[in-house]
């Protein structure tokens, strides 16, 4: 009997603007490798979109979760961002059952995140740094990035151009200082945001 394998990854952990998106893909390693899945950061936006369509067509299960800034703020203020990611990863695992899951770990101690997720779900979990070497994780990274990019584009139409959304981006900092800031799209708990208003 063939082992079913799932991969989980996220997009948007670092920006001060917009949501965090986690995604899961359950599918055949060889088939995913053949279509060219790899770390979403190494692909152009167009290549990601093309692969996203192919992943949806061929995977056994694909799903994602959107974590809004207010929920991120709530958990960051208590030092529990990794716990928040674990909670959403567990929900995705319920939606896409598999025999084994590979997860790109947000924790500096990859095994700690994997052990926690395994304990929470009762499933077999292997947590890795650079997890995109596993085709299912690479596919999940593409799904998460495409979904987040689309949400960010919608946000830009609503609130104006805020640059990359990263605190190192001058355009993002100027937009934050500009005052027309809907609370719900900014991660106020980020230290760099607090410094701007001191």
Curated annotation (Swiss-Prot):
Manganese or magnesium. Binds 1 divalent metal ion per monomer in the absence of substrate. May bind a second metal ion after substrate binding. Its main location: cytoplasm. CDD domains: RNase_HII_archaea_like. Its cofactor is Mn(2+); Mg(2+). Gene3D superfamilies: Ribonuclease H-like superfamily/Ribonuclease H (3.30.420.10). One of its GO terms (molecular function) is manganese ion binding. It is an enzyme of class 3 (hydrolase). It catalyses: Endonucleolytic cleavage to 5'-phosphomonoester. A divalent metal cation binds at residues 9-10, 104. The keyword Nucleotide-binding does not apply. The keyword Metal-binding applies. Coiled coil: none annotated. Its EC number is 3.1.26.4. It is found in: Cytoplasm. One of its GO terms (cellular component) is ribonuclease H2 complex. GO terms for biological process: DNA replication, removal of RNA primer; mismatch repair. Residues 3-198 form the RNase H type-2 domain. It comes from the Archaea. Pfam families: RNase_HII (PF01351). Keywords: Cytoplasm, Endonuclease, Hydrolase, Manganese, Metal-binding, Nuclease. Belongs to the RNase HII family. This is Ribonuclease HII. It comes from Pyrobaculum arsenaticum (strain DSM 13514 / JCM 11321 / PZ6). The gene is rnhB.
